[in-house]
Amino acid sequence: SISEINSPLKPFYYLANKSIENKDSGIRIQIDSEIPLGAGLGSSSACCVAGAAAIFKLFGNISKEEVLKLAIEAERTIFENTSGADCTVCTYGGIMEYDKNKGFKKIEHEPNFQLVIINSNMEHSTQSMVSKVKEFENKNKEEFSKLSNLESKLVEDVLKLVKENKIQEIGQKMNQNQEYLENIGISNKELTKMIKIGQESSFGAKITGSGGGGCIFALTNESNLQNILKKFKDNNYECFSAKIDFKGLNTF
């Protein structure tokens, strides 16, 4: 049974099993991914969405809504409490506003941002970072509540700024967000050093993912892109540029 499998490939066993349960055939899955694994870039969600689309497309037509549902089910085999945020963005593309109670809303605006992703190559565990945040909350309830309120306000501000295409101000908000993350203890010396380089050479830089390792990202524009890439490469960091994809899953 699926529950007995202990492997990061568990979501694919789930998808394959579900797709052929009433069919007299097997299935072989090969995964080719350029996304660094376990680096806070949503590689598992991207693979779950691609896997669900590819596997179920073999047996007939499938809508994006159905792909998303299957991808989230598959991801839950390894991350039980996943919000589905990463799978949703991978499926539909663009920028998503996510609220735990209201769900997802796509922002109908396509800003021309350039991102630089920088990998610390430090292993980290999402679970241990979540525990660390929980521990901080239990010990510092008032401070945690204050930071949560500041974060909610910051998200509201960023949503407005994205719609107005104000890249410089968005960068400042990213730096502010990074301060909040450092306050709750999910950064470390190496990430702080990387972020300092990013903040000095771009509009803003912060941790992506759960922290403790993995990647950071810096926000820039076309004219400054090569300069930032060079800065990080000169400091022996693995980095690459990325743009926001507004199509999402495009095999349909």
For every predicted segment, state its role.
Residues 34, 212, 244-246:
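Residues that form or immediately flank small-molecule/cofactor binding pockets and catalytic motifs
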Residues 12-39, 70:
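Glycine- and acidic-rich phosphate- and metal-coordinating loops
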Residues 38-48, 82-93, 206, 210-213:
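FAD-binding core of FAD-dependent oxidoreductases
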Residues 1-10, 14-17, 58-61, 69-81, ...:
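C-terminal nucleotide
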Residues 2, 31, 35-37, 48-51:
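Metal-dependent C-N hydrolase catalytic cores
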Residues 32, 174, 207-211:
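Short beta-strands and strand-loop turn motifs
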Residues 41-62:
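DPxDG-like acidic metal-binding loop motif
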